[in-house]
């Protein structure tokens, strides 16, 4: 199925290829992937603790400086890893989590 899709794209006209690229969720960089996140947005973040956590996306958000974020995840990472980076940088306004035990900043 996937190979048929890519075959059609490879031999499609330019307009069709542009249309596919515009709807694709594959980004060339982490910064590009998070550029539409605005101050005050709500983010659902996967992973379990720091395992499977989207580290590159979190670093890109930290670098771009979005603030007043509401974040929903199972925890807030640790001080300098995972969501702990955003918490320490005061970019998270509200954190919804089921476990608070590993991050001293979050426990306060």
Language-model segments: residues:
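Conserved alpha/beta enzyme-core scaffold
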Residues: 2-108
């Amino acid at each position: 199925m996937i190979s048929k899709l890519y075959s059609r794209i490879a031999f499609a006209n330019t307009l069709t290829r542009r249309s596919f690229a515009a709807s694709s969720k594959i980004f060339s960089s982490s910064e590009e992937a998070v550029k539409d996140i605005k101050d005050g947005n709500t983010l659902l973040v996967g992973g379990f603790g720091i395992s499977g956590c989207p580290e590159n996306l979190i670093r890109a958000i930290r670098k771009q400086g979005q603030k007043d974020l509401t974040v929903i995840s199972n925890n807030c990472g640790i001080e300098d890893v995972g969501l702990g980076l955003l918490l320490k940088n005061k970019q998270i306004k509200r954190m919804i989590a089921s476990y608070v035990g590993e991050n001293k900043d979050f426990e306060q």
